[in-house]
Amino acid sequence: MTQDITIVYYTSNTENEAFEEKIRQILFSDSQGVPIISVSQKPISLGDNICVGEVGRSSYNQWRQLQIGVQAAKSKYIALAESDFLYSKEHFAFIPVDEDVFYAPLRVYQLCTMKNRVHKFIPMHKRFREGTSIVGREYLLMALESMLGKETWKPGIESPRNMLPHLFHERNSVLYHNSVPVVTFRTDAGMHQHIHDDHPNGIDEIPYWGTVEDVKKAYL
């Protein structure tokens, strides 16, 4: 495992606190000693915490918080971590080859847990996988600086057409094979409510994590 990497965890603290605390606990366990910088809107206990205050949630503020964490890191590589993702020890043991590439795992599933929706594991499209990225620090900072404006914060969830481009947009990116899938939740408290819960490839069970009900019981 390369030690020249920092996990940057960023959150608006709007998910259910008990749920997010479970996410943080397993993240800390799976990090296996990799340094963590957390950037939050309320104080949390995870690595070196930077609390920016309750600036509101939006895609703009999400990337600003990430930028603040990346600027504070000193490592060559950054592993992104979000407050509604389940990663694994395998994920944080990945060793990047190049600094100017966004590396993301091939097997990533969304689990919708919203009311009145079908609860299944749904394969996640490549362009939505920023929260699984491992990338060179300088390349990531360049991407963020090109997206963000002069305003420090812009609260308020944007409409889909007004959201900032995805980090992968027109960037070098590579998908790599992972044996343990990464899981991201779509909850009623989440910023992104859009999900195709009628996806023809939705499944009820995935390796390592188990069934939909297993995961819901463990984390929700």
Placement of each model-derived feature along the sequence:
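N-proximal low-complexity "stem/linker" segments adjacent to membrane-targeting elements
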Residues: 1-22
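A generic structural signal for alpha->beta connector loops
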Residues: 4, 33-34, 46
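Short loop/turn segments at strand-loop or loop-helix junctions that form parts
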Residues: 8-12, 40-42, 51-54, 105-107
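Short, acidic, metal-binding catalytic loop of nucleotide-sugar glycosyltransferases
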Residues: 21-34
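Active-site-proximal specificity loops/subdomain of glycosyltransferases
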Residues: 38-74, 91-93
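Short aromatic/hydrophobic "clamp" motif used to bind/position activated sugar donors
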Residues: 78
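The conserved acidic donor/metal-binding loop of glycosyltransferases
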Residues: 82-86
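Conserved catalytic core of nucleotide-sugar-dependent glycosyltransferases
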Residues: 92-212, 216-219
